[in-house]
Amino acid sequence: MGPPLLPKHVTAVIKCQKDPMKALEMFNSMRKEVGFKHTLSTYRSVIEKLGYYGKFEAMEEVLVDMRENVGNHMLEGVYVGAMKNYGRKGKVQEAVNVFERMDFYDCEPTVFSYNAIMSVLVDSGYFDQAHKVYMRMRDRGITPDVYSFTIRMKSFCKTSRPHAALRLLNNMSSQGCEMNVVAYCTVVGGFYEENFKAEGYELFGKMLASGVSLCLSTFNKLLRVLCKKGDVKECEKLLDKVIKRGVLPNLFTYNLFIQGLCQRGELDGAVRMVGCLIEQGPKPDVITYNNLIYGLCKNSKFQEAEVYLGKMVNEGLEPDSYTYNTLIAGYCKGGMVQLAERIVGDAVFNGFVPDQFTYRSLIDGLCHEGETNRALALFNEALGKGIKPNVILYNTLIKGLSNQGMILEAAQLANEMSEKGLIPEVQTFNILVNGLCKMGCVSDADGLVKVMISKGYFPDIFTFNILIHGYSTQLKMENALEILDVMLDNGVDPDVYTYNSLLNGLCKTSKFEDVMETYKTMVEKGCAPNLFTFNILLESLCRYRKLDEALGLLEEMKNKSVNPDAVTFGTLIDGFCKNGDLDGAYTLFRKMEEAYKVSSSTPTYNIIIHAFTEKLNVTMAEKLFQEMVDRCLGPDGYTYRLMVDGFCKTGNVNLGYKFLLEMMENGFIPSLTTLGRVINCLCVEDRVYEAAGIIHRMVQKGLVPEAVNTICDVDKKEVAAPKLVLEDLLKKSCITYYAYELLFDGLRDKRLRKKKGFTVVAI
């Protein structure tokens, strides 16, 4: 028989055991050992093990047993550990209960217990309650230590009061506490969080000058704050100071830098840093490569990310699920599902087991490519491999089906989800509601929302916004306003998207007074208008020729720091043009770039060119057209049509004909009306050759009636096609009968083909 097990042996075994329930089983089995009695150390080890893994019910049972067998005055450390474990799992009330029961069990809390519960409260956002605990500690005559002050400083920083934290830091010495690196870095981090860079940098320098011993792990926490904000330059400044103090960065430090560089999109810097680590050390680890691969994928550099996956393997590192899933998700989001599937195949060969995230990425990618059948097959494959789909995976597939108009299949999938014991979220219903609205079935979507409410799901703002947008798009404003009333009655505040949908619908169906009244309500409710809001209002005001009010609204945009865009000015310029104020429109057209720094676009030029051609000022229209070309703003089909029509109306057939040919050369298809207008003008001047050339060019471009395509014989088709085109133009009233007669004879006269004028003139 071997020597008996001592409590220290049992404690060591429990600490090494990874399974908390096996640790408890071993702990309980020792009760049967003759002469063995659990001590504070064995109780503490099993309680910490159970608490760490969240087995709180079992932990509480052991606590009860411990109180009966160990003196309560010795248990403060155990209670502190229990509070911390409850706090880590977000069970704040349970942590508070442990603290409050300490007195009851004759274990008087010291500063350590107060610090523990204050830390739990601050980390969970219960700042007022933490302050009350602190005041209670002071009332009981317990002197706070450096950790107490640090926790309070952390509370101040988390509530955006870094200057209050600094005052507390400066007062620590008068309270008998020596400032340490954690206290300093807490306040420095608070300053950086609130973008007080100068104060943060100054305090950091003061800390180094004070001779405080610098701990690299604490410094890394400070760097994490800055890297999260993407402020890598400030990190470099602090690191330079630290290196001069003889403290060298470790791999964790470099990983933070790489993460920060990737977050800012400075991928070249991140790649260079990884290269330096490979060559000079410390050698990159899985986290290093994961940070870089994530950054590259985020910036759509998927193939480069895959290169680093290969380098990672070559360095002897084993990619984890995060590595593979990041690259797979990147390829899928980039519309390269085939490459993602190849990565999956390679990863599986190397021992990777696809999880919910993998299947979600692939299914989402397939749905975006319209491959819904393959997405469904992949979903079923996942089920067959034992993957238990969660709500997110179901929602991904439901959304994909809905976007492809497969609402019935999406609804069946939602029902299947419920049958399998998964509770649909409001988002699940929102996907279906959105899908129905996109198909124009807004009343059906409204009915689904009523079903949703009957099942105990309350719509959120997104649900209401979908319905309001759907009804507003269909110009059913009474229904849209009814939804708004339901929304308000249930305490859901409309947002800018809600009001924009309503304003857009009202703009098209109601008087501008109703539009402006809704806008007034929006502002009174504290909802800030955005650019889209103002563009809708301008459209309404211009429609009713309220141009002074429209200009006033432009000034209001400036006061509200909302920058106008090309649509804003396009709406205003169009309003002035339709009101006959061409000078005002042109002044505004020039002002948009000079005063508002808004670049003109092709649609904006089209508006002003249209106005000048309507007034038969083709000289100005041609000048603006040339300006467009010089600025590399490509004219579109509408621009050419305006120029052709304008010159034909003013009798300048040569330029009208020139712009028509240029239009067709640039790949734009003129309307039959535009073609007919030029043909008529040419025929009036007896220029049958050019007019016939246009007909033949129409045949070459495939601008022919359907009857032409029924002629199989090539020779007959060549002869018949121009005549059929001509008859089609006459039938659709695009050419005059005079032009028809001239061209009918001209197209038959083979001698015309030999004349030089018949050839289409090159521009």
UniProtKB/Swiss-Prot annotation:
Keyword Transmembrane part of the UniProt annotation: no
Cross-referenced NCBIfam families: PPR
Keywords: Repeat
PPR repeats: 39-69, 75-109, 110-144, 145-179, 180-214, 215-249, 250-284, 285-319, 320-354, 355-389, 390-424, 425-459, 460-494, 495-529, 530-564, 565-595, 601-635, 636-670, 671-705
Family, as annotated: Belongs to the PPR family. P subfamily.
Record InterPro entries: Pentatricopeptide_rpt (IPR002885), TPR-like_helical_dom_sf (IPR011990)
Stated name of the protein: Putative pentatricopeptide repeat-containing protein At1g74580
Highest rank taxon of the organism: Eukaryota
Gene3D superfamilies: Tetratricopeptide repeat domain
